[in-house]
Amino acid sequence: MMFLWWLLLLGTAISHKVHSQEQPLLEEDTAPADNLDVLEKAKGILIRSFLEGFQEGQQINRDLPDAMEMIYKRQHPGKRFQEEIEKRQHPGKRDLEDLQLSKRQHPGRRYLEDMEKRQHPGKREEGDWSRGYLTDDSGYLDLFSDVSKRQHPGKRVPDPFFIKRQHPGKRGIEEEDDTEFENSKEVGKRQHPGKRYDPCEGPNAYNCNSGNLQLDSVEEGWAA
C-alpha cells in the first residue's frame, strides 16, 4: 500500500515538472498554486496511510496476548505446551528431569541401576545377588543357604568362608583326596561282589594299611 502511494507521488511530481516546462511564461503564476494543492493532497493521503498502518499494528499486538491466553485456557493444565517443548528439545536431552533426579541419588546406586538396565534380562538376578552381597552380608548368607538347599545333599557347594580360612596350598590337595575317595567308592560299587580287587592293587589305594585290611576282613566275616 505504501509503495503505491509513493509511486503516485512520484508520477505526480514528474507530470508536474513536464507540464510546467511545456506551459508558456504567462501561466507560471497560476501553475505553482495548483501544484501545491496536489502536493498537499498527496502528503495528507500518505500521512493518513501511515497512521492507519500504525494503528492496525498496535491493534494486532494488543489482540495477540488475548488469543494466546484463550488457547492457554483451553488446554489441559498438565499438558500446556508440553509437546512443543519436547519437539524443540534435543532427542537426547528430553529426559533432563530424570537426569537431575538421578544426580540426587547415591553415586554407588546410580551405577548399579545403569548396570541392571544394560544387562541381559536373565542375568539381572545375578546383579541383585552381588548388590546384596556388597550391602548386606546376612542377605548373602540367606541366598547362599537357599541355593545349597536346592542342590543335591552330596554335591552342595562348600562354604566360601570355610574355603578362604584354609591354607591356599592345601585346598587343592584336600579336594583331590575327596575326589579320589569318592571315585574308589563308585568303582567298588560297580564291581561284582566276588571280584572286587584288593584296595592296595587298585588305581586309588586310599586305605592300604594293616589296620584297614584287618577291619575289612572282620566285616566280611560278619557278613558271611
Curated annotation (Swiss-Prot):
GTP-binding keyword on record: no
Higher taxonomy: Eukaryota, Metazoa, Chordata, Craniata, Vertebrata
Region Disordered, residue ranges: 86-131, 150-212
Compartment(s): Secreted
Main location: secreted
GO biological process: eating behavior; histamine metabolic process; hormone-mediated signaling pathway; negative regulation of glutamate secretion; positive regulation of gamma-aminobutyric acid secretion; positive regulation of insulin secretion
Residue numbers bearing the Proline amide modification: 77, 91, 107, 121, 153, 168, 193
Modified residues (Pyrrolidone carboxylic acid): 75, 89, 105, 119, 151, 166, 191
Additional information: This precursor contains seven copies of thyroliberin.
Superkingdom: Eukaryota
Any one Pfam family match given in the protein's UniProt record, by short name: TRH
Family of this protein: Belongs to the TRH family.
InterPro entries: TRH
Protein source organism: Xenopus laevis
UniProtKB keywords: Amidation, Cleavage on pair of basic residues, Hormone, Pyrrolidone carboxylic acid, Repeat, Secreted, Signal
Signal peptide region: 1-15
The protein, known as: Pro-thyrotropin-releasing hormone-B
Single GO molecular function: thyrotropin-releasing hormone activity
Basic and acidic residues bias spans: 86-101, 110-129, 182-199
Gene Ontology CC annotations of this record: extracellular region; secretory granule
